[in-house]
């Protein structure tokens, strides 16, 4: 019999073992679709970003007009830009759902996979931040100024570090140039980290909604899950194109239609919606260094999740108390997101402080306690 190239070719057999003949639990739900959706998001963003970079000029005097030129004069430039800007929002929607699914179903017990995933999230956040600066509108400029300024809160080396990052004494041309370089580089780092993430995942195989070993009941990835993933792609690309074509500026800030002006500060400086929860936590602490530490902790806390798992069951499928707490956490994050978009005045200040406190309390205190309580209730 002739050798099967798919299984014998050095490169194809790697693709085969990770995308075609991969043994997959038969009962994984649609919540497991978001990993592949993130892959599609990354490819879309790299492609549209590459096309945008061909028409972009990383110079403070030309950046804003080069983006306007792309939208007005380049064939389908408006579409490429709208897909890229809104694609970032969908990227974050998918990654937040993906993390939520991992949290709900105890996937974080695959520690290496989880930790590389958190590193991927941090890299994605860095990429989105430097990318938002590139159009050089008012919110781009002031967002860059406010966030980079936070590094000055680091004792002793802070101010030097900030000036080194800026390449001067304020956000200016050198800052824009290096942010463009970083925005070009980081997505390829994300692609590399994704391969590491998948390598660790395929060491153990996928988790499933029951959280039990499913080796006795696995099915090949192709055709079952390739088809399911294609359905997922369609269901994601449909709202993305709808948003990009009908209301492309819905999620953007109107302030960014004004070219950057260091002499005029916008009334409300706020980041894109996907950073608002962290921004609300940052603002809820009246001390600069304390706020920076809380901001860092709000994301870095994900590294601690595997160590805070006290329940004897892996998933929350049969743990109603943990489920309740999980949805309280989701509601809490939505409140933080809303508060982050509001001005710093009563009652938003106190709401933000309470929501920030609740966020850390749920993750660090309540989840381990509830897990232990459920063990007692189930006589484990």
Swiss-Prot record:
Any one GO molecular-function label of the UniProt entry: ubiquinol-cytochrome-c reductase activity
Annotated binding of heme b b562, by residue: 84, 183
Name of the gene: MT-CYB
Functional summary from the UniProt entry: Component of the ubiquinol-cytochrome c reductase complex (complex III or cytochrome b-c1 complex) that is part of the mitochondrial respiratory chain. The b-c1 complex mediates electron transfer from ubiquinol to cytochrome c. Contributes to the generation of a proton gradient across the mitochondrial membrane that is then used for ATP synthesis.
Assembly, per entry: The cytochrome bc1 complex contains 11 subunits: 3 respiratory subunits (MT-CYB, CYC1 and UQCRFS1), 2 core proteins (UQCRC1 and UQCRC2) and 6 low-molecular weight proteins (UQCRH/QCR6, UQCRB/QCR7, UQCRQ/QCR8, UQCR10/QCR9, UQCR11/QCR10 and a cleavage product of UQCRFS1). This cytochrome bc1 complex then forms a dimer.
UniProt keyword terms in alphabetical order: Electron transport, Heme, Iron, Membrane, Metal-binding, Mitochondrion, Mitochondrion inner membrane, Respiratory chain, Transmembrane, Transmembrane helix, Transport, Ubiquinone
Residues that coordinate or bind heme b b566: 98, 197
Cofactor stoichiometry and binding remark: Binds 2 heme b groups non-covalently.
Name of the protein in its database record: Cytochrome b
Cofactor: heme b
